[in-house]
Every structure is written in structure tokens, then in C-alpha cells.
């Protein structure tokens, strides 16, 4: 389940409403979101795990730095990876590799960031799988 929310000036909300997906959050999803906000223990655990796994994935990207990758510092539940503009290791190539291996990330070419991938922080298994797949891509492309 994925829940999102925004607090903004009315013109910004109107702009967001024009580009959002066609389906709003279900009533069940809304109830689950409200209940999760009341569970401080769970929120703290998720926050700690997200910070820990983000640091792990950033470290894995740093270890691949000799291939020209750079993790953009983040305080979010994702990291932004910048790839070289050209050469054997690119964002487009990594995106295709990850998709071919069942991993969906966000290739940001449409947002005018063709050298970048946005990768969400998931579970420990998911995060380690992404790190291993990126390492395999870089090692195979070099």
C-alpha cells in the first residue's frame, strides 16, 4: 500500500491534481494510513530502518564510484544516483538492466535528468538485491 499527502498553496494543489493518477486512495487505505500514524513504535522502527538501509545503499554506490556513480545526499526514503553522461555505465543502461532483473526504479530522463535514477528504500532484502544488481551491472559493463 502506498499513501501520499501534500500541504501546499491552493494553486500548487490544483496543479498536482491535474497531473496525479486517476485513482484516489481507497477508504481502507485511508483508514490504514491514519492507524499507522498512531503507532509511534512502528513509525520509529520504519524511520530507523529507512535511515539505516539508505546509508547502506549510499555506501554501496560510493563503492562503485570508480565507475562514475554518485549518490546524491538525501533525507528521504529514496536515493538519487547520478551516472556518467556517456561510456559503458549509464543511467539508461542501469535502468534497463534493473528492469530486466525484475527491479523497478525511476529513470528520470522525462524530468530532464537523463543521468539519474531514483531508487526507493525498501526492505533489507529488496535493498540488498538492488545493491547487488547495480554492482553486477557495473562490473558487467566495465
Named regions from a protein language model:
Residues 96-101, 106, 110-142:
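PLP-dependent enzyme catalytic core of the Aspartate aminotransferase-like
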Residues 1-64, 70-72:
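PLP-dependent aminotransferase class I/II
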Residues 50-51, 55, 64-101, 117, ...:
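Conserved PLP-binding catalytic core of the aspartate aminotransferase-like
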Residues 24, 41, 89, 114, ...:
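Residues that form or flank phosphate/diphosphate-binding pockets in enzymes
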